Amino acid sequence: MDIQTFDHTKEENPKNLELITDILEFAGNYLHLDEETEISVTLMHNDEIHQINKEYRNVDRPTDVISFAINDADEDIIMDPEMAEEIPANIGDLMISVDKVAEQAEFLGHSYERELGFLCVHGFLHLNGYDHMEKEDQEKMFPLQKEIMNAYGLKR
């Protein structure tokens, strides 16, 4: 996978940036995504994610992770199948609040790295069409999330 990370905080430990890349690569392989699939992850503070949450979701508070899925199927562009195969699928962007990562890790009694990995996997699953708004959706997403985390080695 082509994973781009952006650290708007300019404070994140390089090992955590590696963790993001590693766990998303692992999750992509777990879901059998094409190796050229693209995703971006931006780390930020609460004030920035609060602004994004308010603007795009109409929720006036910071949150831990926001997923922006990208649908590459633009109806205005007509491509033959060969051309479509050559263009990598960009599944979207994740925005993660490092402040929320720290708060939630402390509250839940586990490491910052475990919480960061969890939020990456959680957001990644959203970008791949999983949701938890309805009970039946939760029953698909949450066990898969746990399965990926455990297989990667970030157990609770």
Swiss-Prot record:
Protein's UniProt keywords contain Nucleotidyltransferase: no
InterPro entries: MetalPrtase_cat_dom_sf_prd, YbeY, YbeY_CS
GO CC annotations, alphabetized: cytoplasm
A single BP term in Gene Ontology: rRNA processing
Broad class of where this protein is predominantly found: cytoplasm
ATP-binding listed as a keyword: no
Entry's localization field: Cytoplasm
Coiled coil: none
Cofactor note: Binds 1 zinc ion.
Cofactor names: Zn(2+)
UniProt keyword annotations, A-Z: Cytoplasm, Endonuclease, Hydrolase, Metal-binding, Nuclease, Ribosome biogenesis, rRNA processing, Zinc
Gene3D superfamilies membership: Metalloproteases ('zincins'), catalytic domain
Function: Single strand-specific metallo-endoribonuclease involved in late-stage 70S ribosome quality control and in maturation of the 3' terminus of the 16S rRNA.
Matching HAMAP family: Endoribonucl_YbeY
Protein name from the UniProt record: Endoribonuclease YbeY
Organism of derivation: Pediococcus pentosaceus (strain ATCC 25745 / CCUG 21536 / LMG 10740 / 183-1w)
Gene: ybeY
